[in-house]
Amino acid sequence: MENIALVGMPSCGKTTMARLLSEKLNRVYYDTDKLIEEREGKIPEIFVNKGEKYFRDLETKVLKEVSKKTGIIIATGGGTPLREINRDLLLQNSLVIYLDRDIKNLETEGRPLSKNLETLEKMYGERNKIYQDISHIKIKVIEDEEKTLEKILEEIKNYENFSN
């Protein structure tokens, strides 16, 4: 059974949608950022104390572990798809869904790389193409979680190559 992996900007709703999809589809979900925090502490502290490269290495390590599983839902960190190895890991057995949320609705508090709207706009410009290139499905996130979930479920159902 294929995995479902959610990608997108920080705070676009990946963790929330992974949890809701998990409930609807009766699948276990893994949040790569949460797994990193359980092992290493808060992400902003990792960035300050050990640097972004150390964090990205942890991200790859955790993704390698979870992507060996099947039939799960993976909520990735916003920067996970930036590394080619991570893109390859996601694509090897996952239906990748890009959650595209309006930049003005993204949270900035507690996010080491997205401190304000200007930073988010720059980040979006750098990452949007990567997210689009890696994804099988793109969902425009709206503020109503249930409606967004319904859109995701409908797109999964309609995706011709997906084995549930």
Where are these regions (language model features)?
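A glycine- and Lys/Arg-enriched "phosphate-lid" helix/loop adjacent to the NTP-binding pocket
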Residues: N93-I130
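ATP-dependent small-molecule kinase phosphotransfer cores
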Residues: K34-P81, I85-L91
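Post-Walker A helix-loop "phosphate-sensing" segment adjacent to the P-loop in P-loop NTPases
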Residues: E23-T32
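P-loop (Walker A) phosphate-binding loop of NTP-binding proteins
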Residues: M9
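Hydrophobic anchor at the beta1->P-loop junction of P-loop NTPases
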Residues: L6
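NTP-dependent small-molecule kinase module
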Residues: T16, L20, K24, K69, ...
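Short glycine-rich anion-binding loops that position phosphate/pyrophosphate groups of nucleotides
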Residues: G77-T80, D102-K104, D144
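Conserved glycine(s) of the Walker
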Residues: G13
